[in-house]
Design a protein with these regions (language model features):
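An aromatic- and glycine-enriched ligand-binding surface/loop that stacks and positions planar moieties
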Residues: 24, 32, 52-168
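Short, hydrophobic secondary-structure boundary micro-motifs
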Residues: 2-4, 43-46, 75, 111-114
Length: 168
């Protein structure tokens, strides 16, 4: 995938494939910067919902990307480390560990039972501070997850009153 970090110009319209580590390093740096612009869950009016990005989300995503970048992946020449530099791999593991420890030590998110988490998800509960740290928000007719991944139906359903998950 060609990574575009600047607007297209006639010279950059046809970029070659970008190395995945270039993309992951950029994402790690961007997420580090983003942490200064978002609050912790329930810290302000913007982070009271799991449908808004919080510091827990940015740190969690940063940890996940760091783990992926430090590990093995399928490459055109076979399965190998994403980075051959052992020092960089250790730095990436340290980033993941520190971000996770920061989330845990702050205590803004609590872990409940599986049942409580499942019921909150089914009830479309979006209150921040529980196990779920981020959920993609859908408006009334845009939540086509069940249409895409669920059972197809031709008739209007009882919940959205739309046929085919809203694609008519």
């Amino acid at each position: 995938v060609p990574a575009r970090f600047e607007p297209n110009t006639t010279e950059t319209i046809d970029l070659p494939k970008t190395d995945r580590m270039v993309i992951m390093r950029r994402l790690l740096n961007d997420l580090l910067i983003a942490q200064d612009y978002v609050g912790w869950p329930n810290e302000n009016s913007f982070t009271k919902s799991t449908e808004r990005v919080s510091q827990t989300f940015t740190k969690g995503l940063r940890a996940r990307i760091a783990l992926f970048a430090a590990g093995y992946s399928q490459h055109p020449d076979g399965i190998r480390y994403n980075t051959e530099d052992a020092t960089e791999r250790q730095e990436l593991y340290t980033i993941a560990k520190n971000e996770c420890l920061d989330i845990i030590s702050k205590g803004y998110n609590t872990l409940g039972t599986f049942e409580a988490n499942f019921k909150a998800l089914c009830a479309e509960g979006t209150i921040a501070g529980a196990e779920s740290i981020f959920e993609i928000p859908f408006s009334a007719s845009r939540g086509r997850v069940i249409y895409t991944w669920g059972v197809k139906h031709e008739k209007k359903d009882q919940w959205t009153k739309l046929a085919k998950g809203g694609i008519n």
